[in-house]
Amino acid sequence: MMSDLRLNQLYAGSNHIHIHGHRGARGVMPENTLEGFRYTFGIGIQFIELDILMTADGVPVITHNPRLMPYSTRRNGQWLEIEGPLIAETSFDELSQYDVGGLKPASDYGKRYPDQAFQFGQTVPRLVDLCHLV
């Protein structure tokens, strides 16, 4: 009962809605990219949701999945055929060789967000890069 009371207090008097940018601007711009976050802030959204993982060399990076995913990752202009390396086992320099600026159109994820912008050359950003952007 006590926890219900505290939860209700959070809603008391609130007459506005806070809009959050999920992974930046997922579905509009490539998720978890600096361009996606820049877009989100540019349209006036002040709250963002993101995930942070550590690379093998200890760099905090912004990415949702523990691996690079074939539906959103290209290397040397080609989509990955299978899941890529684990973020935790990849150095930041190695991770930066992958392009995460689009969705593979034929994938389920690509079909789910067919209007998402394709931004060539987007890499998994470091947390510090987002902090500088903010």
Please tell me what each predicted stretch does.
Residues M1-V134:
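Phosphate-group recognition and catalysis centered on beta-loop-alpha active-site segments
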